[in-house]
Amino acid sequence: MIQAILVFNNHGKPRLVRFYQRFPEEIQQQIVRETFHLVLKRDDNICNFLEGGSLIGGSDYKLIYRHYATLYFVFCVDSSESELGILDLIQVFVETLDKCFENVCELDLIFHMDKVHYILQEVVMGGMVLETNMNEIVAQIEAQNRLEKSEGGLSAAPARAVSAVKNINLPEMPRNINIGDLNIKVPNLSQFV
C-alpha cells in the first residue's frame, strides 16, 4: 500500500503532499524534511529505491523516487508494493501531468493545485492504485474540464448569484418570503440601497 506521496523541489519546498495514513502535522513535516534530505544526498546514477523505515514507523517501508528537472516525486510504500511498479506509476503520473498541463513545470503544481490533486486521485486513492492507463486518466480529466466549463466553474458561482439577484426586477421589495413551511420576514432595506 502507498503510505504517502511527496513532491518537492530541489530546495526542499513541498509542492504536493498526500498522506494515506494519519499522522500529526508535526510528524508529516518531519517526514517531508527527512525524506528530502535522504533523497537529495543521493547521486543521480544510484538506485531510486531506499529504505525509509524509521521515517514512517516500520522496517518494511521503502522510498521510491524519481527526479525530474527541479522536482522530486517520492512514493512511500510498504513491502507489498513492487518497486518497479511504483517507479512506472511515478512515470505515468508525471506523463499525465505533462499531457494535462502541456509541459508541466513546478509553477503548474503551485497554481493548479486542485487539478493536480484531481489527477492524483484518478491514479491513487486511499493508498491503492486505481488506474495506470494514461489515456483513461486523461479522458477522465478532460470530461471533468468539460463539466466545469459547462457549469461556468464553481469559482464563478457566487458572482453569478449576486448578478442574478441584482437583475431581478421587483415592483417593490417583498416583506415576507414564504417557501413551503418556512416564512422569512425581510427587514426594510431601502435605507441601504
From Swiss-Prot:
Topology versus the membrane: Peripheral membrane protein
Localization of this protein: Golgi apparatus; Cytoplasmic vesicle membrane
GO cellular component: AP-3 adaptor complex; axon cytoplasm; cytoplasmic vesicle membrane; Golgi apparatus; intracellular membrane-bounded organelle
A Pfam cross-reference name: Clat_adaptor_s
Family label: Belongs to the adaptor complexes small subunit family.
Assembly and interaction partners: Adaptor protein complex 3 (AP-3) is a heterotetramer composed of two large adaptins (delta-type subunit AP3D1 and beta-type subunit AP3B1 or AP3B2), a medium adaptin (mu-type subunit AP3M1 or AP3M2) and a small adaptin (sigma-type subunit APS1 or AP3S2). Interacts with AGAP1. AP-3 associates with the BLOC-1 complex.
Record protein name field: AP-3 complex subunit sigma-2
Organism: Bos taurus
